[in-house]
C-alpha cells in the first residue's frame, strides 16, 4: 500500500534528490581530493576512481546516522502528525530549494556548504508549512548544527596546523636530507596507524546501524580500532617501508610500484648492486611543477637539485604537450573551436557522431588539467599567486614523495567520511518522503533505507566524476601553495573532524572544515600573504548566501503550493 495519489510528489523528490546529490559530488568532492590533485600526489583520473569507490561505500555503510539527523532534528515532525502528506511536500520543497541553489553555485565555481543548503531549504520549507514554531531551534536541532559551522573549521585548522608543524620540525626542515628522509619513513608508519584507526572508528564507533555493530561493547570497539591501525602499520613496515627506503634513500631508480610486494627482501638486499642513475633521470616527479617559475621561492633544496629538477621538467613538459596534441587530433577538428562549439557541431552531424559526443561529454570532467587551470587561468579571485608562492617553502621532492603515498590514504579516508556525512543532505529528505508515501505515517525515528543511501551515493559519484573539476580549480593552489606534506596535514585534519561530527550525528560542513585546514597550513609560513584571502572571502561569501537563498527558494515554493486555490473550497472575503 502507498499514497498513490501523491506518486508525482515522490517522483519529483526522487529527481531533485538526485540533482542535489549530483551537486554535492560536484561541489564537495573538492574537499576530499583538491589537495591530492593540486599537490600532484594523485592524477585526476586516479582521484576520481578512488573518490567513486570511497564516497559510495561511505554513503552506504555509514551514512544512515546523519541522514536521520537531517530528517528528524530540524523540523518538529509532531506538527505534521495528522497531515503526513504535508511533511512529504515540505521535504520535497526543501530538496528543490537546495538543489537549485547548489546547481547555480557549482556552475559559477563557488565552493559552498551543501549542508548549509539543505538545512536552509528544510528551515525555509518548514517555516512555510508550520511557521517558525515548526522548526527545532534549540540545541538538539538547528542551534547545534549552526554552532558546528564555527567550531568545526577552527578545530580542523588547529589539527592541521599541529600535524604540519610536527612534519616541519621533525622531517621537512631538518638540515640533513638523509636524516629528513629517515625521519619521514618512520613518521609515516605512525601516521598510517592513526589514519586507519580513524577510518575504523568511523565504521565501528558507536556502531554503524547498517552494519549492525551497535551491540559491540566498548572494549570490543576499542580493540577493533587499535587492532586495525596496528595491522595497517605492520603491513607498512613489512612491505612499504623497505621499498621506499631503497627507492628514495638508496636511490634505486630501477624499482617499480609492483616491487612493493618484494619489500621484505629489501631488508636483506645489498645496495651495492644498484646501477648508477642515468644522467637526467628523475627519481620522483616534481610536485611543484608549474609553480616554481612564477617567482623566486624560499627553498630548502640545494641549487643542484633544483637545476636538475627544472631541466627534467622542461623535457617532461614537452612530452606532455606532444601527448595532449596527439589526443586532441583524434577527437577535435583542426579549426580552433571552444568545447561547447565542438560538441554542438557533433550534435548537428547526426546520430553517427552521437556516441563520440556522449563519450566527450562524459569524459570531459576527468580529462581536465586542473593544476594548469589553477596556476594559469587568472581572474579576480587568483590574487597575487606569484607573491603567495614566494612566501612559501618548497621542500625536497624525495621527501614529498613519501608523503604523497600517505596523502592518497588520507584522501581515501576523508572521502569515505565525506560520503557518510554529506550524502545525508540529499537522502535525509528523500527518506522522509519515501516513508510517508509508503506508510502514510511520519514515524518518529525511521531507519533510512539502504536503497536511498545507494541512490544518493551513485548520484554523488556521477557528480564528482563529471563536474567536480569546476570547483577543484578554485581550491588547491589558488588558496595556498599545495604539496603532499601540506595536503596530507589538511586531509588528515578534515578526516578527523568529519569522523567526529558524523559519529556524533552532527551534519557539519566539510567545505568549511576543509578551508579551515587549508588556511591554517598556509599560515604555518608565518606570513598572512601566504594565503589567498580573496579566495577565502569567496568561499565565505558563498556560505553566507547559501542558507538564506536555499531557504527562500524552498519556503516560497512550499508556501505557494500549500496556500494555492483549490477546486471545491469556498473562500471568505476579509
Swiss-Prot record:
Alphabetically ordered keywords of this record: Cell membrane, Membrane, Phosphate transport, Symport, Transmembrane, Transmembrane helix, Transport
Consequence of gene disruption: No significant effect on growth rates. Reduced phosphate uptake capacity in phosphate-starved cells.
Entry membrane topology: Multi-pass membrane protein
Gene Ontology biological process terms from the UniProt entry: phosphate ion transmembrane transport; phosphate ion transport; transmembrane transport
Assembly and oligomerization: Forms homodimers and higher order homooligomers.
Name of the protein: Phosphate permease PHO89
GO CC, one annotated term: plasma membrane
This protein's record includes keyword rRNA-binding: no
Role summary: Sodium-phosphate symporter. Active in early growth phase.
An annotated Gene Ontology molecular function: identical protein binding
Induction: Transcribed under conditions of phosphate limitation.
Modes of activity regulation: Weakly stimulated by Li(+) and K(+). Inhibited by monensin. Inhibited by phosphonoacetic acid. Inhibited by methylphosphonate. Inhibited by dimethylphosphonate.
Cytoplasmic compartment segments: 27-43, 106-117, 167-184, 244-354, 420-447, 525-541
Residue ranges, Extracellular side: 1-5, 65-84, 139-145, 206-222, 376-398, 469-503, 563-574
Cell compartment(s), UniProt: Cell membrane
Reactions performed catalytically: 2 Na(+)(out) + phosphate(out) = 2 Na(+)(in) + phosphate(in)
Amino acid at each position: 500500500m502507498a499514497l498513490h495519489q501523491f506518486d508525482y510528489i515522490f517522483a519529483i523528490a526522487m529527481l531533485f534528490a538526485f540533482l542535489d546529490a549530483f551537486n554535492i559530488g560536484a561541489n564537495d568532492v573538492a574537499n576530499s581530493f583538491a589537495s591530492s590533485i593540486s599537490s600532484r600526489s594523485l592524477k585526476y583520473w586516479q582521484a576520481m576512481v578512488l573518490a567513486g569507490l570511497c564516497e559510495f561505500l561511505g554513503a552506504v555503510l555509514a551514512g544512515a546516522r546523519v541522514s536521520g539527523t537531517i530528517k528528524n532534528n530540524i523540523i518538529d515532525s509532531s506538527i505534521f502528525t495528522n497531515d503526513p502528506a504535508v511533511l512529504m511536500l515540505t521535504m520535497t520543497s526543501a530538496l528543490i530549494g537546495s538543489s537549485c541553489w547548489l546547481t547555480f553555485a557549482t556552475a559559477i565555481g563557488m565552493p559552498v556548504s551543501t549542508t548549509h543548503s539543505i538545512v536552509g531549504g528544510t528551515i525555509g520549507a518548514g517555516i512555510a508549512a508550520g511557521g517558525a514554531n515548526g522548526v527545532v531551534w534549540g540545541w538538539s536541532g538547528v542551534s547545534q548544527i549552526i554552532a558546528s559551522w564555527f567550531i568545526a573549521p577552527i578545530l580542523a585548522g588547529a589539527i592541521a596546523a599541529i600535524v604540519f608543524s610536527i612534519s616541519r620540525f621533525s622531517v621537512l626542515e631538518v638540515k640533513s636530507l638523509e636524516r629528513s628522509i629517515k625521519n619521514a619513513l618512520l613518521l609515516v608508519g605512525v601516521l598510517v596507524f592513526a589514519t586507519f584507526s580513524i577510518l575504523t572508528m568511523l565504521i565501528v564507533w558507536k556502531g554503524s546501524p547498517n552494519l549492525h555493530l551497535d551491540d559491540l561493547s566498548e572494549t570490543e570497539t576499542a580493540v577493533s580500532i587499535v587492532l586495525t591501525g596496528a595491522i595497517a602499520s605492520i603491513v607498512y613496515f613489512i612491505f612499504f617501508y623497505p621499498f621506499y627506503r631503497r627507492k628514495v634513500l638508496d636511490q634505486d631508480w630501477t624499482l617499480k610500484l609492483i616491487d612493493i610486494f618484494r619489500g621484505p627482501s629489501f631488508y636483506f638486499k645489498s645496495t651495492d648492486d644498484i646501477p648508477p642513475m642515468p644522467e637526467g633521470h628523475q627519481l620522483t616527479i616534481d610536485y611543484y611543477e608549474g609553480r616554481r617559475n612564477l617567482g623566486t621561492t624560499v627553498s630548502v633544496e640545494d641549487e643542484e637539485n633544483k637545476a636538475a629538477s627544472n631541466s627534467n621538467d622542461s623535457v617532461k613538459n614537452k612530452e606532455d604537450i606532444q601527448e595532449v596534441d596527439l589526443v586532441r587530433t583524434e577527437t577535435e577538428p583542426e579549426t580552433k573551436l571552444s568545447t561547447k562549439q565542438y560538441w554542438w557541431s557533433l550534435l548537428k552531424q547526426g546520430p553517427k557522431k552521437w556516441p563520440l559526443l556522449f563519450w566527450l561529454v562524459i569524459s570531459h570532467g576527468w580529462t581536465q588539467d586542473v593544476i594548469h587551470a589553477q596556476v594559469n587561468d587568472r581572474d579576480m579571485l587568483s590574487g597575487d599567486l606569484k607573491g603567495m608562492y614566494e612566501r612559501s617553502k618548497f621542500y625536497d621532492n624525495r621527501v614529498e614523495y613519501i608523503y604523497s603515498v600517505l596523502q592518497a590514504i588520507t584522501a581515501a579516508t576523508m572521502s569515505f567520511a565525506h560520503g557518510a556525512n554529506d550524502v545525508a543532505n540529499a537522502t535525509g529528505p528523500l527518506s522522509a518522503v519515501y516513508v510517508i508515501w509508503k506508510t502514510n505515517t511520519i514515524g518518529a525515528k525511521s531507519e533510512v533505507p539502504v536503497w536511498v543511501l545507494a541512490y544518493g551515493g551513485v548520484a554523488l559519484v556521477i557528480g564528482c566524476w563529471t563536474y567536480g573539476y569546476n570547483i577543484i580549480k578554485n581550491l588547491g593552489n589558488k588558496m595556498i601553495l599545495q604539496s603532499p606534506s601540506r595536503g596530507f596535514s589538511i586531509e588528515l585534519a578534515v578526516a578527523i573532524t568529519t569522523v567526529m561530527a558524523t559519529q556524533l550525528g552532527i551534519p557539519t560542513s566539510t567545505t568549511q572544515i576543509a578551508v579551515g585546514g587549508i588556511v591554517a597550513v598556509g599560515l604555518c609560513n608565518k606570513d598572512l600573504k601566504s594565503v589567498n584571502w580573496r579566495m577565502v572571502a569567496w568561499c565565505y561569501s558563498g556560505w553566507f548566501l547559501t542558507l538564506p537563498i536555499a531557504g527562500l527558494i524552498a519556503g516560497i515554493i512550499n508556501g505557494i503550493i500549500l496556500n494555492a486555490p483549490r477546486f471545491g473550497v469556498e473562500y471568505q472575503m476579509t
